């Protein structure tokens, strides 16, 4: 990591992403999503209630237009998808070194644990992306996964603070 990110800067970057993505939604939806996501980031352990809260805002993210979240994603087969590296780079404002693939591993195992608690065995597609001339295989996520991804990527990045 090139420089440290303060938790307050991280929170500010998360709020910026939520506000940009949900700009066409009601202020209540934006405030609710922001409160839930920032609240979950600040906790050491996510509780069942946190899982329920994150699940409750998934539909808000699913209903947004792809163009509203394209700035942190990439288009593959006419769908906007997200990678952990893209979100980490955006949250860290390009100060995160994605060649450190620990963040991808952190999310992969967090996602597995989260999916198992939810009683699902969701499979994730993988894509290859090139970062600094290195090929990195990574999982792709969709709009409905954004609340979860924002929480866990931000929690991972806050470890370095």
Curated annotation (Swiss-Prot):
Q: Where in the cell is it found?
A: Virion
Q: Which GO terms describe its cellular component?
A: virion component
Q: Which UniProt keywords apply?
A: Virion
Protein family (similarity comment): Belongs to the mimivirus L761/L899 family.
Return the protein name: Uncharacterized protein L899
Lineage of the organism:
Viruses, Varidnaviria, Bamfordvirae, Nucleocytoviricota, Megaviricetes
